Amino acid sequence: MSIKSDKWIRRMAEEHKMIEPFVPDQVRAAEDGRRIVSYGTSSYGYDIRCADEFKIFTNINSTIVDPKNFDEGSFVDFKGDVCIIPPNSFALARTVEYFRIPRTVLTVCLGKSTYARCGIIVNVTPFEPEWEGYVTLEFSNTTPLPAKIYANEGVAQVLFFESDEVCDVSYADRGGKYQGQRGVTLPKT
């Protein structure tokens, strides 16, 4: 299994629509020249962006967080260019990009250091072979202060690993529960 380069990422995005919309280079500034958190293709990965749809966790219902029986009322929906995450809380969002992962590929996604250095942790599980959809992102604010997340800017880097052999059963083959997800998707069992 080997990590894939920018050349491979560009080819797969352009020829097989692995990432849509796709940015072939690294973008570090907005069209007006303002500095942003970078996104797009990097040497051995792809920096994904956060869309402007958020679900911010709240404790207004004083419920227990249970992944098998998650209370959708624990979130407040928000749409905007900047999401403010309360202290010691978290928010969910989705990527701008839609992914179609090849059968021989597994990805690992890591948060960008710009956010990590501010106490904001981005968590995403691997994209499995033949999974497709928008990625649900989880942002944890580990600080005692409110924290900002910027929509349409970079939030995490996806690394692509290609196996030497094809898996027997892909995510699509087993009917994975998050296959084809479109918006911010809450836990399923």
UniProtKB/Swiss-Prot annotation:
GO terms for molecular function: dCTP deaminase activity; nucleotide binding. SUPFAM superfamilies: dUTPase-like (SSF51283). Signal peptide: none annotated. Keywords: Hydrolase, Nucleotide metabolism, Nucleotide-binding. Pathway: Pyrimidine metabolism; dUMP biosynthesis; dUMP from dCTP (dUTP route): step 1/2. The keyword Glycoprotein does not apply. It catalyses: dCTP + H2O + H(+) = dUTP + NH4(+). Its EC number is 3.5.4.13. Catalyzes the deamination of dCTP to dUTP. This is dCTP deaminase. It comes from Burkholderia thailandensis (strain ATCC 700388 / DSM 13276 / CCUG 48851 / CIP 106301 / E264). The lineage of its organism: Bacteria, Pseudomonadati, Pseudomonadota, Betaproteobacteria, Burkholderiales.
